[in-house]
């Protein structure tokens, strides 16, 4: 029944990449440390996770890992809730390898999220309260999808059929938000699929959503629609402007609510 599941104790944040498409902004610092309304992206993410009851967060680092580790130490100290694992292959592989680096953490229910997705607690609550399925893919809709969107096709019951950037326009029902929840046998299925994918050279340059696509073909992935304007993905400089507007508004809204 929706809302009856406890939040998973674990979350994995994929923050190994540099973020080349942001140009000089990420020449010397990783994308996840870029400030939004005066607060680094990764801090927004972790604070939202902790506030929702998730008490173990693993951050996969790569580019300028020492800067991420320093920030996490300064902000969260040694309370045991936050840990990092280093992906030494970050510059020559894609995020499927970062998932493989963190596979030991995937021993029970966990959230997997991209290190460039900002989101509100309301989004997490919606996903965590969704009906239990092996894999829950958070999705959103918009009038027009661009070439960089990770597009999603659904069946009539909300099961994911396909996840791909190259879906034809007539097959697109939503886009992936970049946050996936694994429950029941989902963690084992995903971990086994990682091991299998990396037996082949093409797995080194693959996205983890290619595994979600494979699991979807077995009707194991259900979509969860998230609230509108509750998230933002940071890929290009224009996204930073959008994120600043969205999250400065949210901060103001929360401040006004607290004062009432």
PLM features per residue range, with description:
Residues 2-13, 39-109, 200:
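Conserved N-terminal catalytic core of the sugar/cofactor nucleotidyltransferase
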Residues 21, 67-70, 101, 122, ...:
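Phosphate- and divalent-cation-binding pockets in alpha/beta enzyme and binding domains
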Residues 32, 81-83, 159, 220-222:
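Conserved beta-strand segments of alpha/beta enzyme cores
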Residues 2-11, 173-260:
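Conserved alpha/beta core of the MobA/IspD/sugar-nucleotide pyrophosphorylase nucleotidyltransferase superfamily
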Residues 120-198:
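Conserved core of the sugar-phosphate nucleotidyltransferase
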Residues 79-154:
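Conserved beta-loop-beta/alpha segment of the NTase-like Rossmann-fold superfamily
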Residues 28-43:
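Short catalytic helix/loop segments, enriched in acidic residues and glycine
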Residues 1-24, 33:
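N-proximal low-complexity "stem/linker" segments adjacent to membrane-targeting elements
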